[in-house]
Amino acid sequence: MNFTRQRTSPIHAGEIISYKNVDLLRRFITEQGKILPRRLTGVTAKEQRQLAKAIKQARILGFLQFLYKE
């Protein structure tokens, strides 16, 4: 018998994916400012699209930086 483990989403049920929720968005960005792929984060395809859209919107509005320099 094969047992597959059901993945749990790193985004909890109460959390809203929004450009204003900067703390949530920072969890899905690398130190260089790149958006992490879903195979590393474990989010669903729908959540990944929402995250990418929210991160890009937050960058344009100035909530997040485009590049993180040392």
From Swiss-Prot:
It is found in: Plastid, Chloroplast. The keyword Oxidoreductase does not apply. The keyword Chloroplast applies. GO terms for biological process: translation. One of its GO terms (molecular function) is small ribosomal subunit rRNA binding. Disulfide bonds: none annotated. PANTHER family: 30S RIBOSOMAL PROTEIN S18 (PTHR13479), SMALL RIBOSOMAL SUBUNIT PROTEIN BS18M (PTHR13479:SF40). Belongs to the bacterial ribosomal protein bS18 family. Part of the 30S ribosomal subunit. This is Small ribosomal subunit protein bS18c.
